[in-house]
A protein has these predicted regions:
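Short, structurally constrained coil/turn elements
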Residues: 25-27, 52
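Glycine-rich, phosphate-binding/catalytic loops in enzymes
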Residues: 24-25, 75
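A short linear-motif detector with a strong N-terminal bias
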Residues: 11-14, 35-38, 99
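Thiol/selenol-based redox catalytic cores and closely related redox-interacting motifs
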Residues: 41-128
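Generic structural marker for isolated residues within well-ordered, non-membrane alpha-helices
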Residues: 19, 38, 72
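Thiol-based oxidoreductase modules, predominantly thioredoxin-like and allied folds used
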Residues: 28-42
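Local sequence-structure signature of Cys/Sec-based thiol-disulfide redox active-site neighborhoods
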Residues: 1-24
Length: 128
């Protein structure tokens, strides 16, 4: 079975913490997690660098692409083996609320505390 790929902002403290949290939940190692700054990562799923600057992305093992809050919910569902996060996200009303909150987080992500950014910890991962 191939892994899903979660693409996140490796220069963001909050994003790095979220990625690390998902990795801890993913005991079966179903998700490969990479910063979009890593050479070739955006292109490997048909995305541009600019698209990855705007949101996190997750490509499932069947090729489905999820963006933003959808990518987070898909990652949680895959990591835990529980469809509930993604099922809730797909419910009308909940999706709109989560997407709105996600947009706020994206706007202020570099002000939200978290871990030392991935690209600061692993500079070789972020060389383009």
């Amino acid at each position: 079975m191939s892994q899903a790929l979660l693409i996140f902002d490796g220069t963001c403290d909050f994003c790095t913490r979220a990625a690390r949290w998902i990795k801890k939940l993913d005991r079966q190692q179903r998700i490969r997690i990479e910063p979009f700054q890593k050479a070739g990562i955006p292109e490997s799923v048909g995305l541009t660098y600019a698209q990855c600057e705007q949101a996190a992305w997750l490509q499932t093992s069947d090729g489905t692409l999820w963006r933003g809050a959808g990518s987070v919910n898909a990652a949680l569902s895959i990591a835990t083996g529980n469809r509930l996060p993604l099922s809730l996200y797909q419910t009308w009303g909940i999706r709109q609320i989560q997407d709105s909150v996600y947009k706020l987080i994206v706007k202020y992500r570099h002000r939200i505390p978290g871990d030392t950014p991935h690209c600061q910890q692993f500079p070789a991962d972020c060389a383009r």
